[in-house]
Amino acid sequence: MDIHRCRFIDYTPSAITAMAFSHKSGQNDSMPNNLLLAVGRASGNIEIWNPRNDWCLKTVLYGGVDRSIEGIVWSTGEEELRLFSIGFSTTITEWNLHTGKPLVNQDSNAGAIWSIAICDETKTLAVGCDDGSCVLFDISGGPGVIEFKRVLMRQTSRILSLDFQTKDHLVGGCADGVIKVWDLSTPNSAIISRMQVDRARKGEAALIWAVKSLRDGTIVSADSSGAVKFWNGKFFTLSQSFKLHLADALCLGVSANGDMVFSSGIDRKTIQYSREGGKREWVSNSFRRFHSHDVRCMAVFECKSLDVLISGGMDMMLAVIPVRQFNRKNHRMISAVPQRPRMAVAPKARLFMLWNDHEVLLWRIGSPGYRFLLKIVLADEENISHAAISPDGELIAISSVLRTKLYQLQYSDENVKVETVEDSFLSNIGASLLSFTVDKNKLILVSNDSEIFLIELSRLDSRQLEVFELSQPTSKKIAPRQRSNVSSMCDGICSIAVSSDGDYFAVADTVGNIFCYSLSNLTYSELPRVNTYVRAMAFRPDVRGRLAVATAGNQVYEFDVQSRKLSEWSKNNSTNMPKEFSQLLDKAFGAFFDSKHPSRFWIWSANWVSFFDLNLQLPAPRAAGKRKIEMNATVDGNLNDKKLANANSNGISNYGTGDSRCFWITHKYRPMLLVGSVGNSELLVVERPIADMLMSKSMPASFYEHKFGS
């Protein structure tokens, strides 16, 4: 099989700018069923991660132009989770976690907001502004209600960081090098303490980038001089000071019981401070470097079964670090490439497409190279949520959270002519997923609240396209927007697949529900539920009505759509996955079948590509040996027996030889944006090496420490 290995795509994700866990830590507490991590990026998008199943991305809340996320807080209630964000504007945004849209935008009635904090006990939201105002809002009215409460005693400097010490004391770190404490119990919310930090370099006032309050009342600050200071929370006096950072300390993390503090910043060091055995004094135990550029934010969560420190910054990757074994256990870096692919392939036309923020780019796979064809730039403020291209490349659909646009393409030897298909329905509905049928006569649209629409495209010249709203499952399992239960939030449709014969399409959600629709009579059938998040699925081209599914638990299932049961292959093999596959940390990003071997179910992720032959039985489980990866591994040409021999020496594992190979996996290609079939016996592999991302023009230089003699 020939592989087109592509590395020229200039795709660089946005920096991570803010993050927060949905629940407060408790070392002796059980893990909440609905524990989530919100990660904000400079593009304005917010990613919602599930710590279960080795950190799966549940959904993305899409932002827009000049809406960088600079602060995130959660309000945790018995009936709902509420998510609030700020972004260098005068607006506080509350997000609808069911639809992914902003629920309400509340103006601060002050300057641009730089910091945000929340007190769940009193349902009070506090924001700090660049004009020195600190504004309180009441959120006790429920989702969508943010009511102005009052403005605290004014001061003149920008408020860079906020945290509630108690329900009556609010701590703010300011741009004049002073930590201020407001007493909210007094009528005028007076400032009861001012704590001055040391001046930064060149005599300038230090910028206090982060403040945190511990359970015993201790206040911790991090500032632009690189200092981390511990303050007595009762008398508001300095207890201890550490100046271990070589540049600005930007963020702080605190353990559940307040016995550990972590700091990081521009110098990339993550430093651990601890107070052990009931001692009053803090000590700096150790430091490690996990990131290659500035660390902008961190969050800590601890419970009985989980203790993690998550950090992120300019290098776009999430670091997952053990809290209690900080300097003893290995950390994990979650790849910067998007877990929901931002690329698609049109196999008949040998085209592939990339979308990002507000633009879509299109290339043709030629012989011997690639040819850039088209760039579509949207005038909308909202970021692109999804896009799709028809198999013959003549139609492209692009969607945001508010609207969908359809384009018709005509190709000539030198140019591509683009015409916009105007339609009032598409102009007023956003989509989370889009897919064309094989004959391009229908567009399947999944709305932000998991409604499914079928748009008839056979008569594009008509004034109004024919639209069918498909019936929803009666159990409402796949339409969680109707329910108020916390556990249903973000559990919308996450995957879609269309059969190559045009008879069926299937949708699946993040809790394992799978529904298959008939394109002829638009009825649906419910398939057996899998036990975890459906990551990718595809229909077999050689057997009618067979759907293969890859889950977040690293399991592969095959369903017979007509009987609504597992196939014989799945009954025999789904619980017998090879260790090389079942123990993978990176979950599947996509799946497909190739035309030369139509029974081979290809699955790929950021750092691996594999296939299962669904006509062959897997052998009995065997222990997974240590995988050795050589950079000169040669599997980018023909996948023949000679190149697949000696599996462990080149990062490849396979069961069987030739056409009798029932399983194969390689770790050579990394990290990947797309893997897809582009013709008979041809694969397209699009890589975006991390080194190329970090050297892109948009990436600032990392901190450099000049040493004597260097």
From Swiss-Prot:
Any Gene Ontology CC annotation: small-subunit processome
Keyword Transmembrane helix belongs to the record: no
WD repeat copies, ranges: 11-59, 64-105, 108-147, 154-192, 199-241, 290-327, 328-365, 488-527, 529-569
InterPro entries tied to this protein: Quino_amine_DH_bsu, UTP4, WD40/YVTN_repeat-like_dom_sf, WD40_repeat_CS, WD40_repeat_dom_sf, WD40_rpt
Keyword line: Nucleus, Repeat, Ribonucleoprotein, Ribosome biogenesis, rRNA processing, Transcription, WD repeat
Compartments where found: Nucleus, Nucleolus
Molecular function via GO: snoRNA binding
Keyword Ribonucleoprotein part of the UniProt annotation: yes
One BP annotation, GO: maturation of SSU-rRNA from tricistronic rRNA transcript (SSU-rRNA, 5.8S rRNA, LSU-rRNA)
Domain of life where this protein originates: Eukaryota
Protein task: Involved in nucleolar processing of pre-18S ribosomal RNA. Required for optimal pre-ribosomal RNA transcription by RNA polymerase I together with a subset of U3 proteins required for transcription (t-UTPs).
Assembly and oligomerization: Component of the ribosomal small subunit (SSU) processome.
Protein name, UniProt field: U3 small nucleolar RNA-associated protein 4
Protein encoded by which gene: utp4
